[in-house]
Amino acid sequence: MKKNFRFFDNRQKYLLIVTTTNEKNKIADALKPIVQKIKPKFPALKIFDAGMGDGSLLMSVMRQCHQKMPHIPLLVSTKEISMEDVRLGLEKLPDRFVEHKNTVFVISNLNYIESTSLKSNNKKKQKKMNWKVVKPVSYTHLTLPTKRIV
């Protein structure tokens, strides 16, 4: 192994570490006292995650925020460059939206310095920015067929 090897430079080695340890749970537990001290400012509690990964840690923090502040809107912005991690993170979101309905969730692949403002410093890139707005879908208005004997 080369000197100064960083395990997160290799996706397979990184995934081996994060999927076989309780590292994310330990970090989430360490964040609980910090979440308990948060005093959100109007209009929402703003959360920025500089590297969403598979979303496990971020979902834990969102859950903690909901437990402490169930009626405060959440504005969550995160950066991720791996489409696989974006997919894994999106899979974990539905129950967060069900539990905390006043949530806005943004994922970008902008540079770190640009991620918090959601605006590229490069005018050419800014013009090509591709926004995808995913609106929630409700099926509660549908009447589903049943096999009831009346």
Label each residue range with its predicted role.
Residues 32, 49, 72-74:
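Leucine-rich tandem repeat or coiled-coil scaffolds
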Residues 2-39:
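Class I SAM-dependent methyltransferase Rossmann-like catalytic core
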Residues 43-53:
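Conserved class I S-adenosyl-L-methionine
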Residues 140-146:
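Conserved small/polar residues in nucleotide/adenosyl-binding loops
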Residues 148-150:
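Long, charge-rich C-terminal accessory regions
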Residues 54-70:
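Conserved SAM-binding loop of SAM-dependent methyltransferases across substrates and taxa
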Residues 66-126:
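Class I SAM-dependent methyltransferase SAM/SAH-binding core
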Residues 132-133:
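Extended catalytic-interface subdomain
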